């Protein structure tokens, strides 16, 4: 019973409290988190990643970025005077910072995304995501008990017919 208070390790405690995801508005952060978790649990993100990685090294943007980074690293290391007392970690961290500050990674990755991910987005990824969302919401609708029917129009109450009028003649 000690586990009942620890929701941090489960990963779903922040979105698990939603009783009816179909009632959430499109774009709601809880709904998005639920859908992302569903895609992850189905392994679809891994599939997207594998699909992109299988294609990335054939694209000119990747080859160009790799060549730029190789040249940058070679130039940087050529400027260093090697000795046995050098701290390799400091050298590595300095090189990493120089590469990041150069801006070449950010620009290169943007080009890679436009060559690898963007073409797959509408034709491959979006249909799979939409299908997963529809299946998820359909399953959630089936799991939820049907909401009670709204009350119909009030039934007319039976009234006793008016008794014979007792008119005084």
Swiss-Prot record:
Pfam families: COMPASS-Shg1. Residues 1-23, 136-169 are annotated as: Disordered. Its main location: cytoplasm. One of its GO terms (biological process) is cell division. Keywords: Cell cycle, Cell division, Centromere, Chromosome, Cytoplasm, Cytoskeleton, Kinetochore, Mitosis. GO terms for cellular component: centrosome; cytoplasm; kinetochore. Residues 1-10 have a biased composition (Gly residues). It comes from the Eukaryota. Residues 146-169 have a biased composition (Pro residues). It is found in: Cytoplasm, Cytoskeleton, Microtubule organizing center, Centrosome; Chromosome, Centromere, Kinetochore. Belongs to the BOD1 family. Required for proper chromosome biorientation through the detection or correction of syntelic attachments in mitotic spindles. This is Biorientation of chromosomes in cell division protein 1. It comes from Xenopus tropicalis (Western clawed frog).
């Amino acid at each position: 019973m000690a586990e009942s208070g620890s929701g941090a390790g489960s990963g779903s405690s922040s979105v698990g409290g939603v009783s009816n995801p179909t009632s959430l508005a499109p774009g709601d952060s809880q709904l998005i988190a639920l859908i992302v978790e569903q895609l992850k649990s189905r392994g679809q993100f891994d599939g997207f990643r594998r699909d992109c990685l299988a294609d990335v090294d054939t694209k000119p943007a990747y080859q160009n970025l790799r060549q730029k980074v190789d040249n940058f690293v070679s130039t940087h290391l050529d400027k260093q005077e090697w000795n046995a007392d050098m701290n390799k970690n400091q050298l590595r961290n300095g090189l990493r910072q120089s590469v990041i500050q150069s801006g070449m990674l950010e620009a290169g990755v943007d080009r890679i995304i436009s060559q690898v991910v963007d073409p797959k987005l509408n034709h491959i990824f979006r249909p799979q995501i939409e299908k997963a969302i529809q299946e998820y919401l359909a399953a959630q609708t089936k799991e939820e008990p049907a909401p009670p029917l709204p009350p119909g129009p009030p039934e007319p109450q039976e009234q006793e017919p008016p008794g014979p009028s007792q008119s005084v003649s």
